[in-house]
Amino acid sequence: MNQRRENYVSDPSAYPDRSADWYEYFDRKRREEIIEIIDSHPEIIDEHERNPFGYRNHPSPHLQRVHNYFRMQPTFGKYYIYTEREWSSYRIAEIREFGKLPVLTDDSFATEEEAMHAVFLKRIEDVRNELSQAEQREIAN
């Protein structure tokens, strides 16, 4: 308590919350790290295709890092497996905001494992696109 009185925050509204700025910064760094892992260890794509549920063998550390990143993302905009017909037809759906119907992709998959791997590939594609868009915004500024 050696701080002098003028060092205290007297009006919290004068100090904007910078957590969103920092989240964007650190999330971009994580996206770059994820793409670096995928590019330097392309075998994790095959590993995921062979075992998309992860129950046969524990995933490699590189695949686990990619999974952890995908799982920490906000719910809105995430993909999930929509069962069109049990045991025979699966599609990918995207979660929208509350009260909005999910968007289904046109692709259909014969097994849940095929659909799960397609979601994995779609998430990787999204991360690449987000990084590309961020780079274009930086160039434009």
Swiss-Prot record:
Subunit structure: Heterotetramer of two DmfA1 (alpha) and two DmfA2 (beta) subunits.
Name of the featured protein: N,N-dimethylformamidase alpha subunit
Residue spans crossing the bilayer: none
Catalytic activity reported: N,N-dimethylformamide + H2O = dimethylamine + formate
Coiled coil: none
EC class of the enzyme, as a word: hydrolase
Organism encoding this protein: Paracoccus aminophilus
Alphabetically ordered keywords of this record: Hydrolase, Plasmid
Induction: By N,N-dimethylformamide.
Function: Hydrolyzes N,N-dimethylformamide, and to a lesser extent N,N-dimethylacetamide and N,N-diethylacetamide. Has no activity against the substituted amides N-methylformamide, N-ethylformamide, N-ethylformamide and N-methylacetamide or the unsubstituted amides formamide, nicotinamide, acetoamide, benzamide, acetamide and acrylamide.
